[in-house]
Amino acid sequence: MRALALDIGLKRIGVALCVDKKIALPLDAVLRKNRNQAANEIKNLLKIHEISLLIVGIPKGGSSEEEMTRRIKHFVSLLEFDKEICFVDESGTSKKALEYGIANTRKKDGKLDSLAAFIMIKDYFCSLE
């Protein structure tokens, strides 16, 4: 089974890949110019990696939770992904990613976002054990 996790933001989309529920790694983030361009890039990743499960982070709590959830679900609908989609709580994943100390927070290159997606996918499969 191959899974892809997405940490969807307004400017960047963090991406992580998991193979056989064991090997996970962050991929390069998708920098959003517009939603169609970003959706096409994600569609390409879904196809190239033969993804059967899409894990998508949803923010829980906070003042903009409802609006961000609506935007994220709309973006996911643009992917036209016909396999399993699992929405998970992404709360605290960016903070955990910062604790890894790998991503430079001053750069807006998406490494932090992809580390957050990596944490989501790792936590998802750990919760199934």
From Swiss-Prot:
Main location: cytoplasm
Compartment(s) of residence: Cytoplasm
Key words of the record: Cytoplasm, Hydrolase, Nuclease, Ribosome biogenesis
Coiled coil regions, renumbered to chain: none
Lineage top rank: taxon: Bacteria
Signal peptide coordinates: none
BP terms from Gene Ontology: rRNA 5'-end processing
InterPro entries registered for this protein in UniProt: RNaseH-like_sf, YqgF, YqgF/RNaseH-like_dom, YqgF/RNaseH-like_dom_sf
Gene Ontology molecular function terms on file: nuclease activity
EC nos: 3.1.-.-
One GO location term (cellular component): cytosol
Function field: Could be a nuclease involved in processing of the 5'-end of pre-16S rRNA.
Family, similarity comment: Belongs to the YqgF nuclease family.
HAMAP family: Nuclease_YqgF
Protein name listed in UniProt: Putative pre-16S rRNA nuclease
